């Protein structure tokens, strides 16, 4: 994915680490 900053804090951490 590669959201970066998402609405969900927990999801944000995962998206931030798995930026793709």
From Swiss-Prot:
Localization in the cell: Secreted
EC number of this enzyme: 3.4.23.-
UniProt PTM: N-glycosylated.
Recorded superkingdom: Eukaryota
Keywords, alphabetical: Aspartyl protease, Glycoprotein, Hydrolase, Protease, Secreted
One term of GO molecular function: aspartic-type endopeptidase activity
EC class of the enzyme, as a word: hydrolase
GO CC field: extracellular region
Tissue: Expressed in chorionic epithelium (trophectoderm).
Primary residence: secreted
GO biological process, one term: proteolysis
Similarity comment text for this entry: Belongs to the peptidase A1 family.
Protein name as annotated: Pregnancy-associated glycoprotein 75
Organism: Bubalus bubalis (Domestic water buffalo)
């Amino acid at each position: 994915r590669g959201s970066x900053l998402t609405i969900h804090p927990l999801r944000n951490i995962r998206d931030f680490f798995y930026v793709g």
